[in-house]
A protein has these predicted regions:
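A broad, structural surface signal
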Residues: 48, 52, 56, 139, ...
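Active-site helix-to-loop segments that bind/position phosphate- or nucleotide-bearing substrates
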Residues: 7-127
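Short terminal or interdomain "cap/linker" segment that borders an active site or interface and mediates
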Residues: 107, 155-203
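Short, well-ordered, mixed-charge alpha-helical segments that flank or form enzyme active sites
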Residues: 111-113, 137, 167-170
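Flexible, glycine/charged-enriched surface loops at secondary-structure junctions
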Residues: 60-68, 147-162
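Compact, glycine/acidic-enriched structural inserts
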Residues: 124-147
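Short, Lys/Arg-enriched N-terminal segments with co-localized hydrophobic residues
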Residues: 1-6
Length: 203
């Protein structure tokens, strides 16, 4: 959260150059199931090849809006006059928060197209690896948006939290999207509250 109520901008939508993303290889390996281990050289080389290909394809984006808000009780917060049941793990983290940054980031439709081509080739090993890479790209987009927000509003803030984690019901994604423009960054919400493109993050 950011505690200053005087801001030059209430909404920022930005394209994120792939080269600006901090892609942690070890996070990719963890997503592939290696934990703290390092995969065999051929798999590491495949990861690097995929990252090079995706760097030329992906058009990562991010958007955030700033809203006034408050903690209502031990499990609820109110943001932009919308109530969220975030649960008893997340709500205390927003203690004394006066403003909230509602955000969405995405690796983009180009990533989905890349994976679709791999599936068409029935290259399931590459599909598995691309899925791990896509998850790390999406989280790296969140980190980059936070950096840009920090430069604009250099105040203390919490970690980002998303529906579906730490006891926050994923169905509240629908309410969250009410605080964002229609199809923010090209991201659409399905009836089951999943986001398309698939490698997107909101919170």
């Amino acid at each position: 959260y950011w505690g200053d109520k005087t801001m030059a901008e209430k909404e920022i939508h930005t394209r994120i150059p792939f080269c600006d993303l901090q892609i942690d290889r070890q996070e990719i390996y963890r997503a592939m199931g290696y934990r703290e281990e390092v995969p065999e050289i051929q798999f590491r080389e495949m990861v690097e090849t995929m990252l090079e290909e995706l760097a030329g394809l992906c058009r990562p984006q991010g958007l955030y809006r700033i809203y006034d808000g408050q903690v209502v009780d031990s499990g609820h917060i109110e943001v932009g006059q919308i109530s969220f049941r975030v649960g008893k793990i997340i709500a205390p983290c927003f203690d004394k928060a006066e403003q909230f940054a509602v955000f969405v980031t995405t690796a983009g439709q180009e990533y989905d197209g890349y994976v679709k081509e791999l599936k068409a080739k029935e290259d399931m090993v590459s599909v598995f690896m691309a899925d791990a890479i896509g998850s790390v790209i999406a989280e790296a987009c969140v980190t980059e948006v936070i950096k840009r927000l920090e430069k604009q509003i250099p105040l203390r803030h919490t970690y980002p939290y998303s529906p579906g984690y730490c006891g926050w019901n994923v169905k509240e994604q629908a309410a969250l999207f009410q605080l964002l423009p229609e199809n923010p960054c090209g991201v659409k919400l399905t009836d089951s509250c999943l986001m398309l493109p698939v490698k997107s993050v909101s919170g």
